[in-house]
Amino acid sequence: MVAQPKGKSAILEKHDDDVVIVAALRSPMTRGKKGGLSQCCPEEMLGQVLKGVVAQSKIDPKLIDDIAVGNVLPPGGGATVARMAALWAGIPNTTALNTLNRQCSSGLAATNQIANEIKTGQIDIGIGAGVESMTQNYGAGVMPEKMSDAVMENEEASDCLAPMGITSENVAAEYNITRDVQDQFAAESYQKAAAAQKAGKFKSEIVTIKYEDEDGNERVIDTDDGIREGVTKESLSKLKPAFSKTGSTTAGNASQVSDGAAAVLLARRSVAKKLGLPIIGKFVQAAVVGVPPRVMGIGPAFAIPRVLELTGLSNDDIDIFEINEAFASQAVYSVQKAGIDPKKVNPVGGAIAMGHPLGCTGARQIATGLAEAKRENKKLIVTSMCIGTGMGMASVIVNEQ
């Protein structure tokens, strides 16, 4: 195995065997049940984003070797919908595809799978993607009716079934993350996202989605519709706890139930150069760690140091941290525990304001991070998220735009 280059100067060097990012795009993130994509089937949503990365990169679809799609709530048997999306997008049947589910990191796990296939010489070009229609597939029905009594006697095993909101309350209680601090963090997420949207900052990363709704009308969706203007800590403080009468997690300081898709087109640098493909970034490394299921939200606090250790980088080397805001409680704790400068975190807002389509988020963060890095002339990006059942994942990406 080739040794991973370590340290900032080594990471920024360019080599023919690097895994580079050729395109990274997403759909709008829209509200579950009532947002712009609530009547759009996930295969059509994902298919249009796949078309977007192919069109932007100008790649011949026949050259795409493999596609991995993150999807947590699989409709139609999981792989079926994603395969349909790729074929409909004009990608030939000779291109392989799989879906995977590592909960909230599925989009990043898919991207990492493709990156590793390129690193090991299995393929030259591939797409890591993610899609979720929480409108269609989220709810009580996704949980099994019967679980093994023997397994449920194990405390940590049974904790895997804890509602995510309860795990947020556990984090807040165990690590003393107050309601006031959570509401302040959430308000800032909304404020940053609203300012970014008003300035048109998301346009370059969004693929407009067109589809026919249930009434036969054509819908054209080109904007995130969960972002709200005028949100303050004071307005959020009026909301009631959502999961426990005495709790601190509310609908206002937790991520939104959303619909969306994202895709990242990756290639070996030598191949991208030979084909004249645009190179916008480099996928350096990813890391995944386990944490107690009852406080699953603390995952980024341990995944980020791990990926920095693997790459020989420090917090000071990183310009942008895209940390998923599943809940304000866990995001605040993770930033504090990992010793990250809050000013570097989610500069254009996060999932509290924009939404968290489960399988999509890991790929969406890459698109958002690279777009922001290009605007601000920044180099190093870390993306990270907590993962249901107790894990965290993180990646290091170089902006080359």
Identify the role of each PLM range.
Residues 9-11, 27-51, 55, 73-75, ...:
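Active-site pocket-shaping loop/turn-to-helix segments
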Residues 62-70, 96-101, 126-132, 183-188, ...:
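Beta-strand segments within the central parallel beta-sheet cores of soluble alpha/beta enzyme folds
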Residues 2, 8-20, 25-28, 38-48, ...:
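N-terminal extracellular/periplasmic Venus flytrap/periplasmic-binding protein-like
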Residues 194-195, 263-285, 302-311, 326-340, ...:
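Condensing-enzyme catalytic core of the thiolase-fold
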Residues 122-175:
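Flexible glycine-/small-residue-enriched beta->alpha junction loops
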Residues 71-125, 159-166, 230-256, 337-365, ...:
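Conserved catalytic cysteine-centered active-site region
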Residues 52-65, 171, 175-176, 272-279, ...:
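Phosphate/pyrophosphate-binding loops at sites that engage ATP/ADP/AMP, CoA/4′-phosphopantetheine
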